[in-house]
């Protein structure tokens, strides 16, 4: 979830040209993480890109925009046209909000942002997913199940190309893919 919440517009290519040529993508190189105020000081200064302002006075934690855990977590992920169009619509909506709210909009360049531009809480994203699951009568799954499903289908589509799937999913080691998803290849 952190990588999704840390996605910024400078890492998204949903231009008209990219959509027409079917080469739309997102580049994952950041994540939002909630950490204790004390832990912020212990994080490597190179890791922390931004510390978001707290919304509560005496909050013991803060949200930070930071680099991912490993170098292999940084990756380009191609997205289908329908997802690209959703992102185009989100960008238009955010631009309208910026015009309406003016200086009240806190622009951190986040793709997934609140009405006022702040990062969305991961719990909100989980709650929204659960709401859709309940409304549609779908089996209960956790958010991480989406990643598992994605890797599963990529393995099937690639004919079991572990290296390709490893790079696309951001797994640091190929054996992480084979251990978790080996049953699909068999």
Which residue ranges define each predicted feature?
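Short, contiguous acidic/charged loop-to-helix segments that flank catalytic cores in large enzymes
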Residues: 65-74, 113-121, 137-145, 154-156, ...
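Active-site lining segments that contact anionic ligands and/or coordinate catalytic metals
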Residues: 23, 72-76, 107-109, 146-149, ...
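Catalytic-site neighborhood detector that most strongly recognizes the C-terminal catalytic loop/helix
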Residues: 12, 19-23, 30-32, 169-186
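Conserved tyrosine-mediated DNA breakage-rejoining catalytic core shared by Y-recombinases
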Residues: 6-96
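Extended hydrophobic-aromatic, low-complexity segments
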Residues: 15-16, 28, 36-40, 87, ...
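C-terminal catalytic core of tyrosine-transesterase DNA break-rejoin enzymes
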Residues: 1-3, 124, 128-135, 145-173, ...
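Short helix/loop segment immediately N-terminal to the Walker
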Residues: 94-107
């Amino acid at each position: 979830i952190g990588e999704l919440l840390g996605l910024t517009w400078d890492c998204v290519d949903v231009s008209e040209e990219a959509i027409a040529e079917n080469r739309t993508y997102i580049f994952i190189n950041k994540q939002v993480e909630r950490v204790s105020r004390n832990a912020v000081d212990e994080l490597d200064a190179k890791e922390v890109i931004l510390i978001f302002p707290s919304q509560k006075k005496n909050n013991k934690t803060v949200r930070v925009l930071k680099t991912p855990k490993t170098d292999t977590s940084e990756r380009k992920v191609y997205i289908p046209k329908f997802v690209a169009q959703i992102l185009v619509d989100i960008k238009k909506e955010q631009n309208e909000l910026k015009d309406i709210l003016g200086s009240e909009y806190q622009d951190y360049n986040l793709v997934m942002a609140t009405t006022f531009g702040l990062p969305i809480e991961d719990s909100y994203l989980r709650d929204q997913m659960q709401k859709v699951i309940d409304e549609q009568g779908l089996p209960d799954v956790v958010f991480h199940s989406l990643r598992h499903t994605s890797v599963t289908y990529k393995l099937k589509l690639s004919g079991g190309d572990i290296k390709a799937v490893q790079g696309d999913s951001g797994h640091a080691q190929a054996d992480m893919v084979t251990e978790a998803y080996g049953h699909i290849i068999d």
